[in-house]
A protein has these predicted regions:
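NAD(P)-cofactor binding segment of oxidoreductase domains
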Residues: 65, 69-108, 143-144
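Core catalytic loop region at the nicotinamide-binding pocket of NAD(P)H-dependent oxidoreductases
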Residues: 155, 200-223
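N-terminal Rossmann-fold cofactor-binding loop
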Residues: 30-34, 52-53
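Substrate-positioning beta->alpha
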Residues: 81-82, 139-140, 184-198, 209
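Glycine/proline-rich active-site loop of Rossmann-fold NAD(P)-dependent oxidoreductases
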Residues: 109-113, 151, 165-174, 200-209
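Conserved beta-loop-beta element that borders a ligand/cofactor-binding pocket
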Residues: 145-166
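Conserved Rossmann-fold cofactor-binding substructure of NAD(P)-dependent oxidoreductases
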Residues: 47-66
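N-terminal Rossmann NAD(P)H-binding glycine-rich loop of SDR-like oxidoreductase domains
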Residues: 3-23
Length: 228
């Protein structure tokens, strides 16, 4: 399988690169030119396409011939970075490719999610502040996911909880709606977020789903999980 990882130089991206290589995938990584050095550990093992992830010609070259595309949707700046990235992937990924996008719990597919007051306050207060500071635009990440949901591609949007570093606890558990009891712990190891993203490439049950994930060994997961 040939896989493109858009946003390969970040912490999540590097985990995905390593996990994809461990599975024997051919990997193409996209990252900003100034961040290419962060991928030096993989030199000779992956192809790197430098450039902003919302540059359409960069994405067009990177996804050519790929069976799957893993996309870190970063709401960077106030110039539609996330939606530009998503649109380029939707437009240029080969027909039939598996597309897996990462985002946070604040994204909703069907409006049935139930959010804690803390998360609602964070989005309501921090979002406008970040936008005023021209640092990030959460609304653009919402728009990016809206475009993904409306597309006829083979997409999955993985909604991550709060993240922590540490050794893998195994494949995270997931639920369709934030607010479900199994997600109550609201914490996932970053490496396991990456693991879920990579595993989703070959899990057709997740096509046209927006799974909200939580760590497999968290208290809520252990209390409510029914599967093996």
């Amino acid at each position: 399988m040939r896989v493109c990882i858009v946003g390969a130089s970040g912490k999540l991206g590097q985990h995905m690169v390593r996990l994809a290589l461990d599975r024997g995938y051919e990997v193409v990584g996209v990252c900003r030119e100034q961040s290419v050095v962060k991928l030096d550990a993989f030199e000779g093992r992956i192809t790197v396409v430098p450039g902003a992830t919302d540059e359409r010609d960069v994405i067009e070259r990177a996804v050519a011939g790929c069976d799957g595309v893993l996309v870190v949707l970063v709401p960077r700046g106030v110039h539609q970075y996330a939606s530009g990235t998503a649109q380029a992937v939707l437009d240029y990924a080969p027909a039939g490719a598996r597309l897996v996008f990462s985002c946070g719990w604040h994204i909703t597919l069907d409006g049935q999610d139930v959010y804690s007051w803390k998360l609602k306050a964070l989005v309501k207060i921090a979002g406008p502040i970040a936008r005023l500071a021209r640092f990030a635009d959460l609304d653009d990440q919402v728009e990016a996911c809206r475009r993904v949901f409306a597309s006829d591609t083979r997409w999955t949007v993985v909604r991550g909880s709060d993240l922590e570093e540490g050794e893998s606890q195994g494949l995270p558990v997931w639920s369709r709606h934030v607010g479900d009891p199994i997600l109550q712990s609201n914490i996932t190891r970053r490496v396991d977020f990456a693991l879920f993203m990579v595993a989703a490439l070959e899990n057709d049950e997740l096509i046209h789903q927006a799974p909200a994930i939580v760590g497999r060994q968290t208290p809520s997961s252990l209390a409510y999980a029914t599967g093996p």
